[in-house]
């Protein structure tokens, strides 16, 4: 079956790099760098759509739902990367943000032939995950036409989940299935069709925004401090202390003492110092106000 790629922006030739193979190394990298500078502007152009998805994810989290990323190749790997960073950064349940890739875990390291062309596989992977109407699905594909992702999106719509797209081609088949479309149009790639480059960079920027924004909206950031971080190594033990110090102005000794009172729960330690509450009262107050330190503090 012949697939017409000529209409895809991500498959067109970039005039700026047509002679890149004869440039010096510095000249070559300069061309790449200039093209990369266009990526942030492409993301800026779709901030309203990104915000809409962030708000939908925050509502899902508050109602017992999840964020599911699904993609093939680079797109799938980027979703898995973003999902895997949420538990250590925000202390979130590993099941709260999930990344799926066509071909399964083995496809993270090595391409699985034809997996992305299997529309039914996308649907069955979501069935196995128990996708439901509380969840948000973000389908990721630079081309906007990957069958695996299209199958997943169609299934998600059928169960009532919120469906968003992250593609770099306007008016793609994926846009017809989505409730919200995020389409940073980054233009042709330096190496024609190599969408791991500008398209992949744009996708990573957007994914960063989605989870960061949703975590902020659900109380996991105080000021700009990651107050739900878990101390899983020596660096993070010290980071917890530093966060308590930054948030409260207390000494390192006071920070360590407050953390020891609440099983090293950074957010609770901050409230202990700022409010004077004991550990149990601080924990209860945070529970009452859904983990938002400012609200708990204002009502202590």
UniProtKB/Swiss-Prot annotation:
GO terms for molecular function: carbohydrate derivative binding; carbon-oxygen lyase activity; ether hydrolase activity. SUPFAM superfamilies: SIS domain (SSF53697). It is an enzyme of class 4 (lyase). It comes from the Bacteria. The gene is murQ. The active site is at residues 85, 116. Its EC number is 4.2.1.126. One of its GO terms (biological process) is N-acetylmuramic acid catabolic process. NCBIfam families: N-acetylmuramic acid 6-phosphate etherase, PRK05441.1, PRK12570.1. Specifically catalyzes the cleavage of the D-lactyl ether substituent of MurNAc 6-phosphate, producing GlcNAc 6-phosphate and D-lactate. Together with AnmK, is also required for the utilization of anhydro-N-acetylmuramic acid (anhMurNAc) either imported from the medium or derived from its own cell wall murein, and thus plays a role in cell wall recycling. It comes from Aliivibrio salmonicida (strain LFI1238). This is N-acetylmuramic acid 6-phosphate etherase. Keywords: Carbohydrate metabolism, Lyase. Homodimer. A lyase-type mechanism (elimination/hydration) is suggested for the cleavage of the lactyl ether bond of MurNAc 6-phosphate, with the formation of an alpha,beta-unsaturated aldehyde intermediate with (E)-stereochemistry, followed by the syn addition of water to give product. The keyword Lyase applies. Belongs to the GCKR-like family. MurNAc-6-P etherase subfamily.
């Amino acid at each position: 079956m012949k697939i017409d790629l000529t209409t895809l922006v991500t498959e067109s030739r970039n005039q700026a790099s047509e002679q890149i193979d004869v440039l010096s190394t510095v000249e070559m990298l300069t061309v790449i760098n200039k093209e990369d500078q266009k990526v942030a502007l492409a993301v800026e152009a779709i901030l309203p759509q990104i915000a809409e998805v962030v708000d939908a994810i925050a509502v899902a989290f508050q109602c017992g739902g999840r964020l599911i990323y699904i993609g093939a190749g680079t797109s799938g790997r980027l979703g898995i990367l973003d999902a895997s960073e949420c538990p250590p950064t925000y202390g979130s349940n590993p099941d709260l943000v999930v990344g799926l890739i066509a071909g399964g875990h083995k496809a993270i390291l090595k391409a699985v032939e034809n997996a992305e062309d299997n529309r039914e596989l996308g649907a069955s992977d979501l069935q196995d995950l128990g996708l439901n109407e509380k969840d948000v699905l973000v389908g990721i594909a630079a081309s906007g036409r990957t069958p695996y992702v299209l199958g997943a999106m169609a299934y998600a719509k059928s169960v009532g989940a919120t469906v968003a797209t992250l593609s770099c081609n306007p008016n793609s088949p994926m846009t017809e299935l989505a409730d919200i479309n995020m389409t940073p149009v980054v233009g042709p790639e330096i190496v024609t069709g190599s969408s791991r480059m500008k398209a992949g960079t744009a996708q990573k920027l957007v994914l960063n925004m989605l989870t960061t924004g949703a975590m902020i909206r659900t109380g996991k950031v105080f000021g700009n401090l990651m107050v739900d971080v878990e101390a899983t190594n020596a660096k993070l033990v010290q980071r917890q202390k530093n966060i308590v110090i930054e948030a409260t102005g207390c000494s390192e000794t006071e920070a360590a003492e407050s953390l020891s009172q609440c099983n090293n729960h950074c957010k609770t330690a901050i409230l202990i110092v700022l409010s004077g509450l004991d550990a149990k009262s601080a924990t209860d107050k945070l529970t009452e106000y859904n983990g938002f330190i400012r609200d708990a503090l204002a009502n202590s």
